[in-house]
């Protein structure tokens, strides 16, 4: 059983090591028969060029591209247009259900998502304040105030992932989640 209110932040450079570590943590939690819910964000590339992002509901596996290089929108992530309707259709019900039924909630790339729409911002804020164990990832150099907000939450631990510690970090996070550290 994981103590309530434990919040884990994983920061690191742009690249896949945060996602790889997060997926390993999710797999370890599921192997412990814990209900993990929330959202994962993945890059979409074409010939090595970033062309968008997808969002996936961890529990239902519902996945859609919400960010495109050729999509006209006032809302941007990394200069890519955001289809806020698609983002809200997956993120909002996923986080609402996670707050009700998950043992552990995950929000991947929280800094990118936080300021896309007022509804998304409100859902993320509500989820950050809920008493459930939470794991979030964000870019290390994010100037987004969400990093400071996460650091100020009660029971939070922030881990900086590097190529050197990427293999042991999931085990360290699991020890913290289980109250062993």
UniProtKB/Swiss-Prot annotation:
UniProt xrefs under InterPro entries: Nuc-triphosphatase_THEP1, P-loop_NTPase
Kindly give the CDD domains that the UniProt entry links to this protein. RecA-like_Thep1
Q: Which domain of life is it from?
A: Archaea
What does the record give as the reaction this protein catalyses?
a ribonucleoside 5'-triphosphate + H2O = a ribonucleoside 5'-diphosphate + phosphate + H(+)
GO-annotated molecular function: ATP binding; ribonucleoside triphosphate phosphatase activity
Record keywords: ATP-binding included? yes
Which EC number(s) does UniProt give?
3.6.1.15
**At which positions is ATP bound?**
12-19, 104-111
- Enumerate the Pfam families for this protein: NTPase_1
UniProt keyword annotations, A-Z = ATP-binding, Hydrolase, Nucleotide-binding
**NCBIfam families the UniProt entry points to:** PRK13695.1 (NF010248)
Function according to Swiss-Prot or TrEMBL: Has nucleotide phosphatase activity towards ATP, GTP, CTP, TTP and UTP. May hydrolyze nucleoside diphosphates with lower efficiency.
PANTHER family xrefs: CANCER-RELATED NUCLEOSIDE-TRIPHOSPHATASE (PTHR43146:SF1)
Recorded family membership: Belongs to the THEP1 NTPase family.
User: Would you tell me the protein name for this molecule?
Assistant: Nucleoside-triphosphatase THEP1
Name the species this protein comes from.
Thermoplasma acidophilum (strain ATCC 25905 / DSM 1728 / JCM 9062 / NBRC 15155 / AMRC-C165)
């Amino acid at each position: 059983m994981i103590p309530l209110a434990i919040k884990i932040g994983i920061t690191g450079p742009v690249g896949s090591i945060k996602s790889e570590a997060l997926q390993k943590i999710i797999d370890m939690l599921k192997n412990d028969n814990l209900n993990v819910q929330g959202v994962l964000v993945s890059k979409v590339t074409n010939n090595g060029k970033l062309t968008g992002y997808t969002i996936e509901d961890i529990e239902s596996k519902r996945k859609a591209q919400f960010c495109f290089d050729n999509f006209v929108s006032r809302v941007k992530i990394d200069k890519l247009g955001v289809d806020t309707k698609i983002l809200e259709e997956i993120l909002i019900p996923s986080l609402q259900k996670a707050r009700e039924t998950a043992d552990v909630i995950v929000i991947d790339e929280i800094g990118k998502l936080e300021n896309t729409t007022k509804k998304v911002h409100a859902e993320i804020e509500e989820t950050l304040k809920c008493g459930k164990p939470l794991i979030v990832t964000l870019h290390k150099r994010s100037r987004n105030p969400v990093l400071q907000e996460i650091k100020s939450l009660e029971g939070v631990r922030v881990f900086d992932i590097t190529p050197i510690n990427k293999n042991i970090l999931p085990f360290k996070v699991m020890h913290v989640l289980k109250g062993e550290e």
